[in-house]
């Protein structure tokens, strides 16, 4: 039991008593206990996401060949967490994620300008004119909205599959780290630079602080 508790603590950052309780609830099944702890941790993380973040770090990543680079600002609540291994690893992983995601332009859906959404909606509706001709008006609208959301979500970092574990989204990875360190974490902005481009793509600030 002791070894299982230690393993769960290492994987989740949860306390000893929480790990023991999860193992008891899961009847000794480590995988089930891990899932229970993750669910509880993510629920706690949601409660922390409105808290102010005034510390953090600026992370940089330059891809092999020096033709692609990323700068990002990742915020947390205290200097202690900013210097912690989980936070620094998250910053590094996010920078690598951004480097790998050529289509990403925004941190989250709420940052997409309404003018961009309307423009894409018009394009999609025009492309589907013949396909939607015989469908009810309400259904046409639903189909267009779904296509628009699918297309634009590819540009939102938090919605992307995590490059190191595609069963998780980037947002879930951030929430897992929030649960692990016990503080709110917020990706404030990022810029992606490609050699030969006139400017890097930089996002605005998140809106949930």
UniProtKB/Swiss-Prot annotation:
Keyword annotations of the record: Chloroplast, Elongation factor, Plastid, Protein biosynthesis
One example GO MF annotation: translation elongation factor activity
Matching CDD domains: UBA_EF-Ts (cd14275)
SUPFAM superfamilies referenced in this protein's UniProt entry, alphabetically: Elongation factor Ts (EF-Ts), dimerisation domain (SSF54713), UBA-like (SSF46934)
Disulfide bond entries: none
Subcellular location: Plastid, Chloroplast
Gene Ontology CC annotations of this record: chloroplast; mitochondrion
Presence of keyword Protein biosynthesis: yes
Source organism superkingdom: Eukaryota
A Gene Ontology BP annotation from the UniProt entry: mitochondrial translational elongation
Function noted in UniProt: Associates with the EF-Tu.GDP complex and induces the exchange of GDP to GTP. It remains bound to the aminoacyl-tRNA.EF-Tu.GTP complex up to the GTP hydrolysis stage on the ribosome.
Protein family per UniProt: Belongs to the EF-Ts family.
Protein name: Elongation factor Ts, chloroplastic
